[in-house]
């Protein structure tokens, strides 16, 4: 029996533990994901963003701002102590006003602190930024045409049906 099957068996026998699996987690992927079954069990928030699916655990927060051809997503909590910005939507709007990858953009994103991941979609391309201290872990994998970004490496394995190397 694989570790994944062992976990599924425990969660089938103790459904009250399902909300603890990948607590505060997120997944951002263009894969088809059934959020009703393991590992989500219908407990996660889901949202279609461009060609991607965003799944966020019930303990986590996320924010989305659209600006012309760009979509800005912030998962977690961010704060800009230099501009005294603590509202994540305001922070995303401020980033969206800047030309992507300009000096002003880099200045703003480098001023952020907190526990977060920022995802910026421009067309079909996704740009991923983690908080400076990596308090919010961010893992990714590409398998064929499938892109998967997540807070948990094992969650990517679950979605892509990959077994973890020992």
Regions found by a protein language model. Name each.
Residues 1-166:
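Cysteine-centered catalytic environments shared across enzyme families
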């Amino acid at each position: 029996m694989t570790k994944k099957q062992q976990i599924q068996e425990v969660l089938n026998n103790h459904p009250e533990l399902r909300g603890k699996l990948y607590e505060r987690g997120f997944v951002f992927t263009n894969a088809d994901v059934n959020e009703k079954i393991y590992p989500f069990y219908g407990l996660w928030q889901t949202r279609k963003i461009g060609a991607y699916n965003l799944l966020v655990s019930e303990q986590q927060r996320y924010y989305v701002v659209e600006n012309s051809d760009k979509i800005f997503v912030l998962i977690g909590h961010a704060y800009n102590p230099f501009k005294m910005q603590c509202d994540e939507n305001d922070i995303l709007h401020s980033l969206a006003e800047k030309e992507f990858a300009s000096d002003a953009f880099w200045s703003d994103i480098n001023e952020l602190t907190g526990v977060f991941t920022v995802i910026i979609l421009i067309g079909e391309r996704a740009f991923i930024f983690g908080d400076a201290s990596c308090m919010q872990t961010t893992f990714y994998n590409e398998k064929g045409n499938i892109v998967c970004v997540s807070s948990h490496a094992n969650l990517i394995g679950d979605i892509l049906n990959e077994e973890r190397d020992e």
